Design a protein with these regions (language model features):
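A short glycine-rich, Lys/Arg-flanked "PGG" loop and its adjoining helix->strand segment in the class I
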Residues: 72-85
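A short acidic, Gly/Pro-enriched loop at the edge of an enzyme's catalytic core
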Residues: 45-56
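Conserved SAM-binding loop of SAM-dependent methyltransferases across substrates and taxa
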Residues: 4-15
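Core SAM-dependent methyltransferase catalytic element
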Residues: 146, 150-172
Length: 172
């Protein structure tokens, strides 16, 4: 989600109309206190979120909200519902396949294993533990495959030094 609203505030300062969503009530409260004009307690998959939006930002490993590889078709279906026909999704993620490379550079992943980018997170601060949740880091080739199957074009527009990338997704 939009978290504390830092990207939203920067876009507002540039005169953009921005809708910021997050599933955390505390994040929405923080955004409101910081001056975000349209901060909503909402999930991307919630049907009450309606578009069309000309740009959707999923930054800071934003692919995580998809949760699991098996959710990619539902994600792209939802994207079709809310993204304007000439709109774009900007998404960044990290390719975790390097964690499974053997000494020869081959991937050491059994076919029956879950997708290597599926992570089960649980946040903890001192003695306070949150519930666990699914988070998806997706390599660009897999993202591109699912995007094309759903009628979208994925372009890698920036590549970082730590197996991370920024992608732009548009309707075909």
């Amino acid at each position: 989600g939009a978290g504390s609203g830092c990207h939203t505030l920067a876009l507002q300062e540039m005169g953009k109309e921005v809708t910021a969503i997050d599933i955390s009530p505390l994040s929405v409260e923080a955004m409101n206190k910081r001056g975000v004009k349209d901060a909503r307690l909402q999930n991307f998959f919630d049907k009450s979120l309606t578009g069309p939006f000309d740009t959707i930002l999923l930054l800071m490993n934003g692919s995580g909200i998809i949760g699991k590889q098996e959710n990619l078709p539902a994600f792209f279906h939802r994207l079709k519902e809310v993204l304007a026909r000439d709109g774009q999704l900007l998404l960044d993620s990290s390719d975790l396949s390097y964690l499974f490379e053997d000494e020869d550079g081959n991937l050491d992943i059994a076919p029956e294993d879950d997708y290597f980018g599926e992570i089960d997170f649980r946040m903890q601060y001192k003695s306070i533990k949150g519930d666990s949740f699914d988070w998806l880091y997706i390599d660009f080739n897999t993202l591109n495959l699912y995007a094309r199957q759903a009628g979208f074009k994925a372009e890698k527009i920036e590549e970082g030094e730590h197996y991370d990338y920024l992608a732009r997704i548009t309707h075909l």
